[in-house]
Amino acid sequence: MKLEKLPEEFVQAKPVLEKIIEHGFEAYFVGGSVRDILLGREIHDVDIATSAYPEEIKDIFPYTIDVGIEHGTVLVLAGKSEAEHYEITTFRTESKYTDYRRPDHVDFVRDLREDLKRRDFTINAFACDVNGQIIDLFDGLTDLKERRLTAVGSALERFNEDALRIMRAMRFAATLDFQIENKTFLAMCESAHLLEKISVERIFIEFDKLLLGQDWRNGLTLLLKSGAYKYLPDLQDSALKKVLTDLSVDFHFQNSEQAWAALLTRFSNVDVKTFLRKWKVSNEFAKFVADLVSAYELDSWDLMSLYHFGLEKVLLVDELKVAYGLKINREQAVTINNQLQIHDKSEIVIAGKDLMEEFSLEPGPELGKILKIIEEKIVKNELKNEQAAIFAEVKKML
């Protein structure tokens, strides 16, 4: 098939491909960008594959950066903006994956078929030439039409090469609303234990995208059916099942933190921060999720809880509670938030140094205690956030 019109991202990159072709080599748009065009989705990255070897690409273009030259990838700086920087990768074949993550070595080749047949799924194995002609060597167009995910060649080999492809399959099922072809799914089940060989950081990225997918239920169901969850840090099948049964069927997560909090509210006897530490997330992410889980356990909001958690988190929790079938007062959080004089400690008009100067106080626990009391009284609207009022209140304490 041929595209009626090249997308703007391809039009912008077209001169790069044409220059490679002028020098006697082949060059194509490949991978996820071609798939997304065919699905009518937004393109994120433009990937270019070529029969030219890395050194030949560097001879063609004056400005390049070696970003992964050992794997055949050179960054071509076709313009000043980052949007005009393109990763160009030589056609290649790959050796065995002894670590189930990356090939021991790659061999550069001139044949497009050899390059495409090493890819994970047929819907990711398309190539598109400068005129918009789609090259489909593995019947990916049929799979695309039938919304089916099929491994290229032997599914077992593909998953043994890189076990992360098991998570990618479930992520694609969730984000694209695809079903997984039977042989491919059976190979996923057989290879699921290999996920233990994959870094938890890489698994987190795929699982996180799965949860944010429009059909995350499909992805989560596949995670359970395949048994892959057993090889991910501390996932409880009972909790995953509760998420599927308890959340309203049309609910979609607003962000990653809300999605992970939704999971953790269904867990039994879990320390949120310990759990997330095993997933090696950032401290900031872990705190956000832990706050959501803590806030979820509250029956109602008051000034202190709004101040402590903040309106953003409270509204995310309210959404979650509604999705889990709990009755809440949707207006309560906003109403209470509007009653707060301050939303952060930094908004208090005085600081510790002001009290030290005014009352000849020394730094230490006593000063800290006074500041804490002042903060709480302001939050509860028992004290105005004004210097004179605060000084008068402190005077009473001393």
Curated annotation (Swiss-Prot):
ATP binds at residues 32, 35, 119, 162, 165, 168, 171. The gene is cca. InterPro entries: Bact_CCA-adding_enz_type3_sf (IPR050264), CCA-adding_enz_C (IPR032810), CCA-adding_enz_firmicutes (IPR023068), NT_sf (IPR043519), PolA_pol_head_dom (IPR002646), PolyA_RNA-bd (IPR032828). It is an enzyme of class 2 (transferase). It comes from the Bacteria. A single active site specifically recognizes both ATP and CTP and is responsible for their addition. Its EC number is 2.7.7.72. GO terms for biological process: RNA repair; tRNA 3'-terminal CCA addition. Catalyzes the addition and repair of the essential 3'-terminal CCA sequence in tRNAs without using a nucleic acid template. Adds these three nucleotides in the order of C, C, and A to the tRNA nucleotide-73, using CTP and ATP as substrates and producing inorganic pyrophosphate. tRNA 3'-terminal CCA addition is required both for tRNA processing and repair. Also involved in tRNA surveillance by mediating tandem CCA addition to generate a CCACCA at the 3' terminus of unstable tRNAs. While stable tRNAs receive only 3'-terminal CCA, unstable tRNAs are marked with CCACCA and rapidly degraded. Keywords: ATP-binding, Magnesium, Metal-binding, Nucleotide-binding, Nucleotidyltransferase, RNA repair, RNA-binding, Transferase, tRNA processing. Its cofactor is Mg(2+). GO terms for molecular function: ATP binding; CCA tRNA nucleotidyltransferase activity; magnesium ion binding; tRNA binding. The lineage of its organism: Bacteria, Bacillati, Bacillota, Bacilli, Lactobacillales. It catalyses: a tRNA precursor + 2 CTP + ATP = a tRNA with a 3' CCA end + 3 diphosphate; a tRNA with a 3' CCA end + 2 CTP + ATP = a tRNA with a 3' CCACCA end + 3 diphosphate. Mg(2+) binds at residues 45, 47. CTP binds at residues 32, 35, 119, 162, 165, 168, 171. This is CCA-adding enzyme. Belongs to the tRNA nucleotidyltransferase/poly(A) polymerase family. Bacterial CCA-adding enzyme type 3 subfamily. Homodimer.
